[in-house]
């Protein structure tokens, strides 16, 4: 009886609360408009592409800022999907070589870090980004690759990883022969496994390579790897597939994420970056029939779930690029990756190289997209508004300041009225300590004092009046490790 009375009491209290709840007339918000207050710096990007026929035109997809385009070689960028599509996270970009006005983009993130954004399928433009049409595949949620036939822009392959947090059927390799009006699923492994990488042999577009990745994400951890992680090949445009990952020379045991590339100079030469106990860079010189391991350095395969991307040079069969925290180049067939290409930001995720000029390239990293026209010796700046903030709050300043923690970067506080144009742009915003995924709060009585968190339970206190910052976390040691020189 007591339990029944308690239940009735709770329900009655809930009904009273609902009855007293205020209803807000949404017309009061109709005149409110969004405005950009900054910062003018880039955030994470997973996909990019350029056009062989238009040497100054490039695209990159932001994980939270849509698709961006430049027509002057990366000096100025502009968003081309804002207000035109219903997806803000663009993970795959492909430009048709025969008509650069045709661009396909895929939504969602497939580098499955702890905080990711899902997409809603594939979009297409036929006028260089002025207008867009949704082509379906909405339930894929995370698309890793889009590949356009080199001579027929209506033939397109999509590699879909699928739902990051659960099983679903709309994953695998999809193909269209009518520009995206209809799709056919040509490779499906299981509801638990999607596609991590996909590439077309430029010398014979009927030959396609794909890698399947068995992965499952939770907010607190990720399971990756299993018996369905494999390397696949089709010789008939996706009609049938054969497995290459059990061929002689490939690692035995459980595999994880695999990246794949084929040399445009020699179609028999393949490279794969394989996550496994005996993983590393593997090369085949007979189109996948046999393999040899050429390199197993940790710098190329650390945090495989976040990287595992490899790219063949379009002119030199001995040159291959591997992306990880840093950007590496090999000129001896993948044996040594001793040339590090310096880019404006770390954590590299995608690379497009002009098939007609290997000095022209664009890369995507955790700072956005950047362009090089000299083979990576120099790059354009990443000064566009694609900053990815994990958390935001406001202060009691007048006018109030907006404070946020940026992915793979510092925290930042910006006056809500934006840049006053009365001081240098560099003084527009200020760091308040902490970083990346941490929460921030300012003191209610003194808004110039900030408490900010970061990865690994780090906590700092920052006093803006004297620029003093100090660590105040409960445990004083950085749990991820310290150099031996700093130990007592």
Go through each PLM region and give its residues:
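Beta-propeller blade termini and top-face loops
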Residues: 22-488
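Sec/Tat signal peptide C-region and signal peptidase I cleavage site
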Residues: 16-21
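Bacterial N-terminal signal peptides
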Residues: 5-15
């Amino acid at each position: 009886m007591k339990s029944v009375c308690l239940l009735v009491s709770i329900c009655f209290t809930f009904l009273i609360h609902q009855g007293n709840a205020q209803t807000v007339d949404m017309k009061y918000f109709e005149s409110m408009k969004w405005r950009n207050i900054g910062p003018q710096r880039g955030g994470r990007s997973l996909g990019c592409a350029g056009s062989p026929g238009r040497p100054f035109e490039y695209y990159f997809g932001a994980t939270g800022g849509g698709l961006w385009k430049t027509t002057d070689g990366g000096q100025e960028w502009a968003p081309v999907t804002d207000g035109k599509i219903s997806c803000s996270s663009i993970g795959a970009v492909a430009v048709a070589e025969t008509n650069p006005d045709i661009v396909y983009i895929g939504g969602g993130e497939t580098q499955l870090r702890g905080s990711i954004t899902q997409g809603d399928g594939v979009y297409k433009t036929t006028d260089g980004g002025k207008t867009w049409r949704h082509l379906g595949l909405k339930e894929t949620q995370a698309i890793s690759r889009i590949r356009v036939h080199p001579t027929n822009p209506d033939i397109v392959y999509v590699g879909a990883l699928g739902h990051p947090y659960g099983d679903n059927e709309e994953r695998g390799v999809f193909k269209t022969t009518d520009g995206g009006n209809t799709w056919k699923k040509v490779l499906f492994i299981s509801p638990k496994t999607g596609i991590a990488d996909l590439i077309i042999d430029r010398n014979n577009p009927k030959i396609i390579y794909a890698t399947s990745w068995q992965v499952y994400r939770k907010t607190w951890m990720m399971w990756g790897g299993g018996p369905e992680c494999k390397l696949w090949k089709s010789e008939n445009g996706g009609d049938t597939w054969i497995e290459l990952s059990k061929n002689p020379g490939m690692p035995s045991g459980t595999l994880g994420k695999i990246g794949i590339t084929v040399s445009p100079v020699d179609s028999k030469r393949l490279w794969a970056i394989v996550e496994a106990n005996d993983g590393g860079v593997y090369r085949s010189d007979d189109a996948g029939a046999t393999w040899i391991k050429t390199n197993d350095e940790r710098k190329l395969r650390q945090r495989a779930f976040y990287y595992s991307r490899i790219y063949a040079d379009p002119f030199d069969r001995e040159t291959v690029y591997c992306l990880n925290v840093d950007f590496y180049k090999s000129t001896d067939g993948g044996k040594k990756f001793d040339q590090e290409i310096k880019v404006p930001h770390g954590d590299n995720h995608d690379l497009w190289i002009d098939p007609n000029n290997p000095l022209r390239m664009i890369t995507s990293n955790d700072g956005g997209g950047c362009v090089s026209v000299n083979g990576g010796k120099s790059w354009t700046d990443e000064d566009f508004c694609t900053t990815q903030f994990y958390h935001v709050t406001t202060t009691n300043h007048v006018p109030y300041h907006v404070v946020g923690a940026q992915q793979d970067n510092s925290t930042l506080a910006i006056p809500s009225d934006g840049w006053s144009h009365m001081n240098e742009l560099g003084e527009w915003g200020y760091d308040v300590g902490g970083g990346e995924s941490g929460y921030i709060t300012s003191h209610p009585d003194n808004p110039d004092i900030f408490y900010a968190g970061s990865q690994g339970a780090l906590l700092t206190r920052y006093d803006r009046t004297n620029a003093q910052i100090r660590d105040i976390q409960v445990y004083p040691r950085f749990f991820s490790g310290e150099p031996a020189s700093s130990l007592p």
